[in-house]
């Protein structure tokens, strides 16, 4: 046999040997069985891999929890930001409305004074119509009048005391309303101007006592 023929036979034998030990032979094996076989043959290596996988899974869970926590915080911060912005817009709208209403109240005062001055009938009719329209606008904005009756306890938050006068009303109560006040959404826009009673004068009390004595006789 020649050298070339000998080499060919040897190469063929090696190819057959490689084919018999090819990895493709194990491709169809059950993965679980393969792991079981590895665990049986090299338990320490498989155990180490399991520990590493558990640690990696724990790290991933921690990272996931951290991301979820951060996301929830960001969502809460955004919701709080939206609420603050909405409250700020509401305050700005309320301030703008209050400023407009205060100007309208000044116009109302002027119209009221015009009505009290016995204007001509033609003018009075127009003023009264404008007065009613203005009151409708104020009502639509939720504006309410502050008009305390005589004898009402004074409230420094709602009443502006012009002076104290002698009257038959109890001491410290409203004697007379001079100009109505107004409030909107629970906030006083303008306090009512009032006089406060000091109680009846000494002469009045003496007269009352005298009348009582005369009645007894």
From Swiss-Prot:
Heme recorded as keyword: no
Q: Which UniProt keywords apply?
A: Chaperone, Cytoplasm, Stress response
Which cellular compartments is it found in? Answer: Cytoplasm
Gene Ontology molecular-function annotations: adenyl-nucleotide exchange factor activity; protein homodimerization activity; protein-folding chaperone binding; unfolded protein binding
> According to the lineage, what is the superkingdom?
Archaea
SUPFAM superfamilies associated with the record: Coiled-coil domain of nucleotide exchange factor GrpE, Head domain of nucleotide exchange factor GrpE
Disulfide bonding pattern of the chain: none
By its UniProt entry, which Pfam families does this protein fall under? GrpE
Output the GO biological process annotations, alphabetical, semicolon-separated. protein folding
| InterPro entries given in the database record | GrpE, GrpE_coiled_coil, GrpE_head
Q: Where is the composition biased (Acidic residues)?
A: 1-28, 136-152, 204-217
Which Gene Ontology CC terms are recorded? Answer: cytoplasm
Region annotation Disordered: where it falls in the sequence: 1-44, 135-157, 193-217
* Quaternary structure annotation from Swiss-Prot or TrEMBL: Homodimer.
**Family per UniProt?**
Belongs to the GrpE family.
Its biological function? Participates actively in the response to hyperosmotic and heat shock by preventing the aggregation of stress-denatured proteins, in association with DnaK and GrpE. It is the nucleotide exchange factor for DnaK and may function as a thermosensor. Unfolded proteins bind initially to DnaJ; upon interaction with the DnaJ-bound protein, DnaK hydrolyzes its bound ATP, resulting in the formation of a stable complex. GrpE releases ADP from DnaK; ATP binding to DnaK triggers the release of the substrate protein, thus completing the reaction cycle.
Q: What is this protein called?
A: Protein GrpE
Q: What gene codes for this chain?
A: grpE
């Amino acid at each position: 046999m020649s050298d070339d023929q000998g080499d060919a036979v040897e190469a063929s034998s090696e190819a057959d040997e490689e084919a018999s030990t090819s990895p493709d032979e194990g491709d169809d094996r059950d993965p679980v069985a393969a792991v079981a076989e590895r665990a049986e043959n090299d338990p320490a290596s498989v155990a180490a891999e399991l520990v590493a996988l558990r640690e990696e899974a724990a790290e991933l869970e921690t990272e996931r929890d951290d991301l979820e926590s951060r996301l929830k915080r960001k969502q809460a911060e955004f919701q709080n930001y939206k609420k603050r912005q909405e409250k700020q817009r509401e305050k700005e709208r309320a301030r703008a409305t209050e400023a407009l209403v205060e100007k309208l109240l000044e116009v109302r005062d002027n119209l009221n004074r015009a009505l009290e001055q016995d204007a001509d009938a033609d003018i009075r009719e127009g003023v009264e119509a404008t007065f009613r329209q203005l009151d409708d606008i104020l009502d639509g904005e939720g504006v309410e009048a502050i008009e305390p009756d005589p004898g009402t306890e004074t409230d420094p938050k709602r009443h502006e005391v012009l002076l104290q006068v002698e009257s038959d009303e109890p001491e410290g109560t409203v004697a007379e309303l001079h100009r109505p006040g107004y409030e909107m959404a629970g906030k006083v826009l303008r306090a009512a101007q009032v006089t406060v009673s000091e109680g009846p004068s000494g002469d009045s009390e003496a007269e009352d006592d005298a009348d009582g004595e005369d009645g007894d006789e």
